[in-house]
């Protein structure tokens, strides 16, 4: 197991492991650095990040405007030029100028999403104790 995002790709670059879980962006950077690494989205876990604001936040309106702005497809269409995690606004795929090969390699590309298993936070909320017990058992082996 790895302890940080940087470590997952470094383990592959140094040939310390033959297989690993990890974030596609880290593996893409390792590949750019010359590592012999590849991955597939087949049966991968599709996970999302999010923004949150505390209840009663004093600048809620500004935060909401920020979220509306960064969600616009014209901004997200440029995201693949900087990082390979892919846009979350599907309309960005219709307007991006990124090369087809790059676009089709993104996890959020419409051809890749059906291959993956979405992470269910609802499931983890309902099965927290069971999941923790199984994880601890796995880690102690």
Q: Where in the sequence are the language-model features?
A:
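Extracytoplasmic/periplasmic, Sec-exported soluble proteins
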Residues: 1-4, 45, 54-59, 123, ...
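Venus flytrap/periplasmic-binding-protein-like
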Residues: 40-46
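Mature extracytoplasmic/periplasmic domains
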Residues: 45, 54-115
């Amino acid at each position: 197991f790895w302890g940080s995002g940087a470590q997952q790709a470094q383990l592959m670059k140094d040939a310390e492991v033959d297989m690993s879980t990890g974030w596609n962006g880290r593996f893409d950077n390792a590949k750019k650095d010359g590592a012999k690494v590849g991955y597939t989205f087949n049966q991968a876990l599709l996970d999302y990040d999010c923004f949150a604001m505390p209840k009663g936040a004093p600048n809620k309106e500004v935060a909401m405007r920020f979220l509306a702005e960064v969600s616009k497809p014209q901004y997200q269409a440029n995201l693949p030029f900087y990082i390979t995690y892919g846009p979350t606004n599907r309309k960005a795929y219709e307007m991006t100028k990124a090369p087809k090969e790059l676009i089709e390699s993104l996890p959020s590309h419409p051809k890749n999403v059906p291959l993956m298993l979405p992470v269910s936070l609802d499931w983890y909320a309902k099965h927290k104790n069971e999941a923790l017990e199984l994880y601890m058992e796995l880690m102690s082996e």
